[in-house]
Amino acid sequence: MADEPIELPIDGVLDLHTFDPREIKDLVPNYLAACQARGILSVRIIHGKGIGNLRRTVHAILQKQPAVISFTLDHPQFGGWGATLVQLRPAAV
C-alpha cells in the first residue's frame, strides 16, 4: 500500500510535509511542470521550518529548473521561511 502513487491536486500549492525527502527530487519538478501546463504560474511549496534541510533541497532543485523565473520565501504572515513562492514562465506553445 505504501508504494501506491499518490494523486496530488494540481492547484498551485505543494505541501511536502507527508513526503520522504528522497521523493522530492522528482516530485517538485514534475509538480511544477504540471502547474505550468495548466497555466498556474504562481506556486507555493510548503516545506516546513525545521532545521532547513528540506528548504535547502527545494531551493537547489528550483535553481536548476528552466521554467522557474524566481523564487522567494513566503511572507512572514503566511508561513515565512516554512514556504517558498515560485514564479514560473508560461508554457511554450
Regions found by a protein language model. Give the residues of each.
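Long, charged, low-complexity intrinsically disordered regions
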Residues: 1-93
